[in-house]
Amino acid sequence: STAYALNAPVLALIGQIPLGAIGKGFGLLHEIPDQLSILKSLTKKADRIENAESASKILTSAFSSLQSGRPRPVGVEVPVNIWNSQVEKFSDNLIGHPHQGPNVNTDRIEEAASILNSSKRPVIVVGGGAQNFSIEINNLSSSLSAPVIAFRNGDGIVDGSSQLSVTLPAGRELWGHCDVVLALVTRCQTAQMTWGVDDQMKIILVG
C-alpha cells in the first residue's frame, strides 16, 4: 500500500499455498481467502503463475506494466509447488518493449518556458517521480538559479551539498516569496495545502 501511495514501480513476488489447494479452505499455513483479489486491490496489476509455461508471458506483462503509465506496484503470485518448475525456453524479453510516452503539447511547453524566463524568484519542487531525471533537473536549476525543494521521495535528485538544494524549513520560507513554482513529477499537494498559495504565484505542474 505504501508503494501504491508513493507511485513506486515495485515488483512484488508473492508466495502462495499449493495450486491445487487454493480456494479449498483446507486451513493450510499461510492460507488467505482469495489472496489474489487482495493483491489486485493493492497494486496496479496482479496475476498468478499457475505453470512454468505461463511464467514468461505473465512476467513480461508485469514488467511492461511497471514501465508504462503511472508508476505503481505490480504483483505476481506464485504457488509453492510451482517455484521449482522448469521450462524448456524462456522466450519473452523481460525488459519489455519501448512504450510511447504521453503526447507533448508544445504550446504549453513554450508558455511554461516563457513564464520561467521572465520569473524573478523561481523555485523548483521535485517528487519521487523525478528520480530518473537528476542530471536534467540539476542543469535546469543551475540555468534558472532556482533553489530546489524536495519532499521525502525527491531527496537526492539534487545533491544536499549543492547551494541550490534547500531543506524544507528553508523551502517554506522561499515558498512565501517566490513568483513561479515549477513542480516536477509531483502534485505539490503538501506545499499548497500547508504553505498556501496566492494570486501572485504561478504554479507549473509537469508530469
Describe the predicted segments one by one:
Residues 1-207:
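N-terminal alpha/beta PP-like core and its mobile active-site loop of ThDP/TPP-dependent enzymes
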